Amino acid sequence: MGNTLKIAVPMAGLGSRMRPHTWSKPKPLIALAGRTVLDYVLAQFDSLPKSLQVEYLFIVGPNQREQVEAHMSQHHPEKVVHFFIQEVMRGQSDALYLAREHLRGPLLMAFSDTLIETDLSNLDHIEEDGLAWVRPVEDPRRFGVAVVNEAGWVTHLVEKPQDVSNNLVVVGFYYFKRSEELMSAIEEQFQRNLTLKNEYFLADAVNILLQRGARMRTRQVNVWLDAGIPAAVLETNRHLLDHGCGNSIEAAQREGVAIIPPVYIDPSARVQRAVVGPHVSIGAGCVLEDVIIRNSVVDTDSQLRGLLLSDSLIGRQVTAEGKTSQLSLGDNTWLKE
């Protein structure tokens, strides 16, 4: 692999399924296990060979760049990031095509609300033209699947298949050895107007590549996490805390707080007369007093008092008092019962 590796992350979606949280921030900046979804998306690439030069291509919506750019400058200043604005939501292929001037040579593409665990340490020795990461599921009809022949090569991708015998669901993580060939396939996709509900899906461009003779294999993953809806964010938060992303030992040293691991409590948060856990993430600058909370995520600078909380997502700078048992509050909300 002689070229700089580009990593494209389309994130321009409106995040309507994550409202009210996405009224004020892009979906990738939703809090999750002490960090943000975007931080964990970037962590997927930690196993890349250190010899590779990496540049990121972020395709964002018209009102998202400022917050995402500020987050990257503060938390990932060492990363080279190019931004592209997708003014109209016309799908994955359209998003990638916006970055075409930067796309020569190898490309990784990952969705901004999906997390997987995979080893990328040998990516600089890949002989195939492409890779699609997959996971077997019981019912693949809601997803896209990769059809593989007896020799292990991908023959084509199928969106929302009716035949459930093929259950290798594509998890939204791809590698292309020559991204310029993908751009050419996307151009043909545009010319043929291959759309689904007025969106250009990447699967159609991949099928064009395969029809042209590209050789693609699959890689299976055991962990595939979603952060696209509130229930999935809480489930992903549980998984991450269960697998070492918390700080339960440090949190247990706080006075006046009962900790039920696993949890993450930012060192700057003030927690008094509280029972925290299991599966709770509390961000920087938060204040929790007289609170019992479990299976919840609380973003930065929020104040919670006198609450019994479970299965809740709390945004930034939220003030809530009372006895409510389940909340989903976006940023800058005030609630008193």
Label the predicted regions.
Residues 29, 146-148, 218:
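A structural signal for short hydrophobic beta-strand segments in well-ordered beta-sheet cores
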Residues 13, 113, 136, 229:
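Active-site glycine-centered loops adjacent to acidic/histidine catalytic or metal-binding residues
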Residues 188-337:
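Left-handed beta-helix
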Residues 1-12, 17, 23, 30-31, ...:
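Conserved N-terminal catalytic core of the sugar/cofactor nucleotidyltransferase
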Residues 18, 68-72, 182, 186, ...:
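Hydrophobic packing residues within well-ordered alpha-helices of enzyme cores
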